[in-house]
Amino acid sequence: MRILVIGASGMLGSAVCQVLPRATAISRGAGNFDIDDLHIDGYDWIINAVGVTKPMAQRDDLYRVNAQFPRDLANASERAGARVIQIATDGVFSGARGRYKESDPHDATDDYGRSKSLGEIHSPNFVNLRCSIIGPEPHEPRYLLEWLRRQPPSATVRGFTNHLWNGITTLHFARIVAGIVNNDLAVPSVQHVIPTGAITKANLLRELARAYGRTDLRIEDAEAPESIDRTLITERPDVNAALWRAAAYDQPPTIPQMIDELV
C-alpha cells in the first residue's frame, strides 16, 4: 500500500508522517502546489494536509489552496484510482449557535470559512474529516499551543470564557487517518470527528499550560466581544466511534486526555 502526504512539513502533515512513517512526504509552501507536479499515479491513499489558515490568510492563496486545489486533487485522484483523506474545518460555521452537525448549512462570512467550504469535495473517493485541531508546530510558530508555550515566565494571558471548543490534537487526527488507511474503513464524504466533551478556550489554555509544565502562567478569565461556539456534533455517532476504535480507543477520548498524550 502506497500513501502520499501532501503538506508534510506543516503542523498537521508532520504529525501524520510521524504516525505513518512509510508514507511519501511532499513538503512545499502552501501556495506552491500544482496538481500536475505531484505525480499521484500509483498511490492508494492521498492525505491532503495542506491549507492556508487565518493567521496566514491572503485572499488569493485562500481560494487557490483551500478551494481550487482540493477540486483538482479530487479529479486527479479519481483518474488515478486513489482515495483522498482531507481535513475539513469547523470554520465553515459562523459560531453563532454551536452543536453543528454534518448537514447543517455553512454560514461562515469570512474568506477563510468560505474557501474551506468550497474545498469540501463530495465524491466517492474523497473523505472530509471535519474538526478543529491544535498541536505543536515544527517550524514557525503561529497557533495557540506554541503561542502559549513561548510566553515569558510568569506571564498573564487572557482566556475567553465565551469561546467553546471540542476539537482534537494533530496527533489524534493522525491516528484516525492511520486507522482509516490500515483498516480500509468506509467513511462518508463528510464526517465530524469529535472527542468526549467540550471546553472553553480559557480552560483549554489551562490544560495546555498544565500538560506542558507552564504552571507559572496566570490564565485570566475574559469575555471576548463576540461569543463563538463552533462545537460539533455528529449525525453518525456510530461512525465517529468506529473511527476512534480504529485509532485504538474504546471510546472517544476527552480533551485533557488528548493533551496529556500529546506531550
Task: Please describe what each predicted stretch is.
Residues D72-T109:
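Conserved Rossmann-fold NAD(P)-dependent oxidoreductase catalytic core, especially the SDR/UDP-sugar
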Residues T170, A198-R206, D221-V263:
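Conserved C-terminal active-site "lid" loop/helix of NAD(P)H-dependent oxidoreductases
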Residues I121-W165, L171-H172, A178-G179:
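NAD(P)-dependent short-chain dehydrogenase/reductase
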Residues A174-G179, N183-R230:
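Mid/C-terminal beta-alpha module of Rossmann-like enzyme folds, strongest
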Residues M1-L20:
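N-terminal Rossmann NAD(P)H-binding glycine-rich loop of SDR-like oxidoreductase domains
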Residues D34-D72, A76-E78:
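NAD(P)H-binding glycine-rich loop region in Rossmannoid oxidoreductase-like domains
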Residues I6, I46-V50, V84-D90, L129-C131:
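SDR active-site strand-loop-helix element
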Residues Y112-K116, R130:
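Active-site YXXXK catalytic motif of short-chain dehydrogenase/reductase
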